[in-house]
Each structure stands twice: as structure tokens, then as C-alpha cells.
């Protein structure tokens, strides 16, 4: 490894101005601190100039690694050879000894001691120079005797991307523009070039995270402060080392705790602190206090472990820059005579192959290593891709992270093709994944490395199938790396599309259209008809006017408008007349024509169209098997307009076949799309056949890299966890300050769950707890939490959670992170909490009353007359709801938001009549307008039915959803006075499946009976819809499971 990558890269700090603490005057490992152990003032000055002209003498410690006491200025401490401490410093002691009157014998002793200290100082300087030479810290020594700067010509433009050419410089920073406040220039006040400017452009290194002014970059290069090394120089004179040394960097702000003493780095006023508080390694992320008691000299020498993600990091010792061979005159004249006339094609081919490749990878095989290549598409997900790219550069070697907007993945995969146990992470959409899989096919790597997916943007059906979720929120990159490392390798079928001209049509009858598809291989789906027509219109409009499609919201609105327009025009209504489909020899054309499908999908994975499941889950009585992505079969599904609409609310299409080969003939130009890439294909014959199987990384539910779950003994049987909720306003303002965010949180209740409970199950319990709170809102009891630190009681929150709440991960050291709802089943409660869970409610109304900081609370109950027996733990009986939770009681004053009457009233105002008429006629716009003008949703019509009853009976899903979102929760299970039926009963009688699913998802009771004792499931059975009855029964059984898994105490 070269000199720049071997040791400690620390900022040379300026001389102390006035009294200061010892480590602030000169860092524990600043150049002055390394060589300033002088015994007199003159030797101290000489040592300071020799190593850093701008620094004064700093702290010193002996070779034994002992600690020095703090002094009042630079060079105020000096440690002796045996570790003894002289509080005044050697120079101060010698000066004081010359000034104080003493006896002759005492004076001789002092002179002898001074002579010994001089000798010791000389030996220390020699030893430090040797240590610097061994560790590669030549950048700390002056390049010129007087320390004068040397001009290197005109200033070059700061580099923002990695250099893969033969001119690449090891340890070169990657500068990105930044405007983050609170980060001071890394050079400090003494060396900063624009320290008096109020505002100056700054840049941040994406690799080591230091911030400097743009004008100070040249000064940073003069002091030779290098970034962490990413490769090593080749050549016989550079012996290979199999380990990496630390890359130490000064930090003015640092999260976490000191590796040595275990204490935090918090300061009283740390936002604009100019003091160096920590020294951290850019590789392993270990951090130490900037004190000689914590950071010691041997830390420079010791190898770096590369931290928690060492198994996926490509060490810089593996990446070698090969020097270009220089042709000498003697070598050119000494040409050996050829004794053979065999062709040298292989050698010439190798030379051509290696031409232009100054880098090679020489890995060291280890069964514990799973090196990771990260490919990021910055154009996916707005600006998410750019942020993800920078975060991976911080955690990994930048030369294993590639920006796909700069170049494709082929060169990187070719470079790393011989690395064993290689894994790939594709950060982007499904198109990015398909691009990488196609390159892997082209290179024919053996074995093929598995590919994981970090979903960016929208859609992401393949990522959903592999448990990576529908999109990236703000999950810590550290956890993503653990998930990729521990993920399960599964297979993904890939299918060929072979297109030929339709032989049944003469050339003169061929219509306009392209003669080939955009892709000849698909991983997700291949479709034709309505969905492809809508996608094609969007792509054609975006290509014609790209400036009108720069907003995700506008894109969605255009999709909706195009779909509605196509629905009215019925442009795909005759699709079944112009296609012929043969699956494994079975002709499906008659069935397609009978059912008049307007869309046909050949589906490889269970997900389609941003998460829907068109194949569904066929039962045992069907002739089809559940869908899999590795069984070598493709599913053929037909859609009418009705089934396409039902797809968004849990429905499925018409299952046609599961086959290994498809022959498709089209007799007119038809819109088609391959994995989201649309075109209008001329009449053709298309053959679909299995191509191969790709290795993919599936996100595992249990993460073996988490030490908490490694040991089965560490998982308790039961967890008692307090639930706190946080508003979006507090989260956005305080999510980097965990303590203040805890103070701003509001207690919600206490759950007692199983030790292996996941978040999906926990969500059900929290929602049920909210329902229990509302059902007893008329009680006269008030419950408080008592803070153990302040002893002040805190009333729990009475505000109902909105449907959009999500869990927060509170275990990270730096901040809270949101957890995607689609990935809740992959997280355990123990992974995101320590005795308490935090949830984020974006619609929560922030209270003006400031809360006290919550500790681990005790339950305190204010006794009320008539209820003391219920609240006595020894006498009270367990009151169970459907989910098995104890029903708490609260005082009316705590539930003032829900204290108004829930009794249905007849329409009074004109707006009330307008709302009732809008619901009966199905006019959503009129309903929204009347409600905004003051109309009530708690009105009744003829037959004493609520608005939700009418909406459920008519089957208008949009109106049902609007009432659920804006109306009180009591409407869900409210029964009419004549039949005792709830809204779910009405929808089940009318066999409105979509409405039933909306009501069930909103929390409607599945076991409430009508006046005849019938449940909604029994009503659906009587109405002749066994599928709907089976669905309601399965949802009822799913909720009953919670009885044995949950105990709630309030």
C-alpha cells in the first residue's frame, strides 16, 4: 500500500490562543503532538517547526501508552519514559528550576534531570520519526526544510467522480457541493483561506465526509491530507499487504460512544463547536475521544478490521493499478528469433483485452467474504439515487460503487468477474435490474453472482416479489448491507421473446408498426392490449414534450387520464378478435373470444402493476397451482375492464393457463409492453420460451447478522413495550436529535407481546388498542404515566391514529428511520425498539402542551368512585375484545376530540340533504363539496340507515372510501334499527367484494350479527358468493389468531 493510505490522516491544528484544554490546543495525533515532547522551550520550538510550522508544541505521552494530565495551553503536558506525569511540562519545569533559589546540591540534581530529559526528547523524536516512516505518515513531515509551500501550477478542478484511468491518484477526495449548515471548514480558523467571509462555497467529500471551502481545497492538498485509499500501486517494489490500516480523521461532531472509555461525544454547545472532539476511522467507523487517555499511539499501527461490514467491503489491497510498461531501447533491440511459426492469437487477444484497463482485481478467497458490487441509477426515484450513491461510498470502498448514469455495468462486472462469492445490489427500478441481468448473460459469468434489489422510484414489482418492498424510504444503509449479506439466494425464471412476421398475412396487408419488441427477454411480464396502450400513450407524450413530465404527480394524473380516455373510446375492445394464443399445444383462442378480454398478460412473478396480484391464490378446488417465479412455468391471465378495476382492490384476472411455451399470433398492429417498455408491434408471430434462471437475493425475514437474534436464548417469551407516537412536524424538525424527539413523543399505551412478534402483527394490536380506547370513551377513569425521573404524571394520548401511521426504527445511533409498511412482516419488534416503540403519524395534530421527557413509566391510576374494584389488579377481570386485549377506561376530558354525540340525526340543513342525495345517487364530487360546506356525515335516511349503509349497498367504492376517511369510526359497526345490519352486512348481501375489502381493511367487525343472528360471512354465503364468504371467514380467523399472541395492559 502507498504512503497515503497507511496511517493517520489528521488535521494539523493551530496554536492555542490563551487557556485551553489539553487536547484542544494540539490534537492527540496532530503533527505537533507527535513530535513535541521537548524538555526545554528551544527544543519544543524546534520540534514544532520540524513537523508543522503553524502548530505549537502539543501534548506528549510515553511509549507505554500512559495518559497525561490536562494543562492550560499548548505543550503544557509531557509524559516521561516510564509514564510519570509532570503536570507543568518539562519545559516549564526546567524554567521554573532556573528561577527558584535552591541549594547547590539541589541545583546539580536539576541540571542532571534536565540533561536526562534532553536525551529522552532526542530519543523520542527519533522513535516517532521511525513510527511515521513505518506507518506511512510521511505527509506529516515537511517536504521542505523551512516548511514553505511550493506552487504546483494552476489549481485543478475538484474531482467529483472516481478516476479509473492510469493517472488515478490514490487517496484523492471526491468533492460534492454542499450547503449543510453547522459544518465548519476542516482546516480550522488558522489555515482556512476564507475564514472572514460570511458565505463561501463549500464542498464535502463523499468518502471521508470532511467539509472544506472550495477555496481551501488547494491548501488541503498542500498539507497532504489524503482521503482513504481505494487501491494499491502495482510493481515489484510495492510489497503486498493483506490488511488495511485505519484512516483516522478529526471530527468536531461525532455520534455514538468512544471505543476506549465508552462515553458519548456530546458537548454542551456542540452545534458550532470549533474543538476537535473525536478521532474516527473512515473504514471501520470506530471513534475515540481526542484525548491521550483514549486515543493512543498504537492505534496508528494496528490493522483495521473494516468494521461491521467487512464481509461485503472490497479491501483496497485487492484493487491494483497496473503501471504501463515502458519500452526501452535495449529491450527493443533484443528481439529473440522465433523458432516456431504457430500463431500467437491468444496472446494478442489477451493484450487487446487488457488494453485500456489499468486496474486489476486480485482477491483473497475466504468463505466468510461476500464482496458486494453496488450499481446505482441516480435517475430513479427523483434525487433518491444520488443520496443512496453517496451513502454507499461512505460505508464501502468507492471503487465497488458504480454510477450507471456515467457508464454501464459491463466494465465493472468484467473487472470483478473472478471475485469469489460476489454479490450485486441494483439500486433502481425493475429496468435497472433487467439491464444488469442481461449483461450477466452476455458475460456468461460462472457461477453467476446473485442480484439484490434496492427499489427506487415507483412500481418495483420484482423488488416486492423478493421482499425488498415497493420503494426506498430512509432505511439505514447499514441495515441494507446486512440484509444483502444475509439474504437467501433464489432463482428467477427468464423468458425469451422470438418475433417473426406473421406468415398467415401477405406483406401488402401488414399494417404500420415496429417489427420487433423493445426487449427480447423479460423477467416480470409481457402484455398486450389496454394496459400497454395506456403506457404507450404516456411514453409517446413524454418523448414529444419532456418538459411537461417532470413531476411524479403529473405523471400519475396523465396515466389516469389516458386510462379513462381509453376506457371511453374502448380502443382495446376488439383485442380478442385479432389474436390467437396457443399454450403447450392448447388453443385458448375460443375462450379468449367468448370472454372478450381487453388485456392479456403473460406473468412470470406474482406482482404486477405496482404491487397487485392478478393470479391471486387459487384454492385446492381449482385446477391451477400457486404462482412461483422459479418453477419454469409462466401464467397466462385475461382481463376485462371490470376485472382490471377490481385488481386495485384485491381482485384477480381470469386464469387461463400455466405453461412452458406460448405461441402468439396477431393479425393487426397491437400495443404491447415488455417489463414496462411499450411499443406498437405490427402483425407478428411471437414465441415465448424459457431462457434460463438468474440468481437473485431474497430478503430474509430473520437476519442472522443481528446479534440480538443469533442466540435463541436471548429472545424472551414476552415483551412489555410502551408505544409512543410522534407527529410529522416533530419528526422532520428533530429526527437528528433522538433525545428531543423522545421528549416530544406522546405515550399511547403499553403492549405485552411475544418475543418473536413482527411489526405486521404488532400493527394489528396497536390498531385494536385504538378501537378499544374509542369504545370506552364515556368512562369516568383517567390513566396517567408517571415519569420515573421527574415523577410528573403524563396523560396518554386520546387522539386516534390516522390510517397512514408507520413504525420508526429507534435503534440506530444517529437518528430515527421510517419503516416501509410493505416490509413490516420482515422486521421484529426487538429489532427496532428497546422497551418502547415509536410510531410516526403524519396526520397527528400537535398539542401545545409540552411533554416531560418519558422514562420507563410505571402505571398510575387515579381512583374513581365505583370503579376501584375494576382497577384493582387482584380483583379485576380480563375484558377481551376480538384481538385479546384488555379494554382500558378513560375520562371524557381526555377524549374531547370524540366527545360529541354519535347518534344519527335526520338531515337538517340543505347541505345535509345534499350529502344524502349524493350518496344515494353515487355523486362523489357533490358529496365532497357538500361536506366541505358544513354538511354532516352523521345523518340518517329512510329506514334509519347511515350514509355508509347506503354507500355499501349501492357498491360505490369511492364514496365508501371517502366516508371511511372523513367520518367517525363508529359508522363502521353501526347497525340500522330495522334489520340490525352493519355496512359490511349490506355489502355482503349485494356481493360487493371491493366494498367488503375496504370495510374489512378499515376495521369493520366480522363477528357482529344482525337481528337474525347472521354474520357478514353467512350473509355472503346466502347471497350465493362462496368466494366472498371464504374471504370473510379467512379474515375473521386471521384476527382470532391474535388472542394467544397478545396481552395488553394499560
From Swiss-Prot:
Broad class of the protein's primary localization: other
Characterize the regulation of its activity: Activated by phosphatidylserine.
Q: Where is the composition biased (Basic residues)?
A: 332-347
> Which SMART domains has this protein been placed in?
ANK (SM00248), C1 (SM00109), DAGKa (SM00045), DAGKc (SM00046)
Residue ranges for the region (Disordered) are: 52-73, 325-356
Which catalysed reactions does the entry list for this protein?
a 1,2-diacyl-sn-glycerol + ATP = a 1,2-diacyl-sn-glycero-3-phosphate + ADP + H(+); 1,2-di-(9Z-octadecenoyl)-sn-glycerol + ATP = 1,2-di-(9Z-octadecenoyl)-sn-glycero-3-phosphate + ADP + H(+); 1-octadecanoyl-2-(9Z,12Z)-octadecadienoyl-sn-glycerol + ATP = 1-octadecanoyl-2-(9Z,12Z-octadecadienoyl)-sn-glycero-3-phosphate + ADP + H(+); 1-octadecanoyl-2-(5Z,8Z,11Z,14Z-eicosatetraenoyl)-sn-glycerol + ATP = 1-octadecanoyl-2-(5Z,8Z,11Z,14Z-eicosatetraenoyl)-sn-glycero-3-phosphate + ADP + H(+)
Boundaries of every DAGKc domain copy = 367-502
Q: Name one GO biological process term.
A: neurotransmitter secretion
Query: Which molecular-function annotations from GO does this UniProt entry contain?
Result: ATP binding; ATP-dependent diacylglycerol kinase activity; GTPase inhibitor activity; small GTPase binding
Q: What does the record note on quaternary structure?
A: Interacts (via PDZ-binding motif) with DLG4; controls the localization of DGKI to the synapse. Interacts (via PDZ-binding motif) with DLG1. Interacts (via PDZ-binding motif) with DLG2. Interacts (via PDZ-binding motif) with DLG3. May interact with RASGRP3; involved in the regulation of RASGRP3 activity.
- The question of whether Lipid metabolism is a record keyword is answered with yes
Q: What does this protein do?
A: Diacylglycerol kinase that converts diacylglycerol/DAG into phosphatidic acid/phosphatidate/PA and regulates the respective levels of these two bioactive lipids. Thereby, acts as a central switch between the signaling pathways activated by these second messengers with different cellular targets and opposite effects in numerous biological processes. Has probably no preference for any of the diacylglycerols in terms of the acyl chain composition, especially for the acyl chain at the sn-2 position.
User: According to its UniProt record, in which pathway does this protein act?
Assistant: Lipid metabolism; glycerolipid metabolism
Q: Which gene encodes it?
A: Dgki
Give the source species. Rattus norvegicus
Identify the residue span(s) of motif PDZ-binding: 1048-1050
The ANK repeat boundaries are 943-972, 979-1008
Which protein is depicted? Diacylglycerol kinase iota
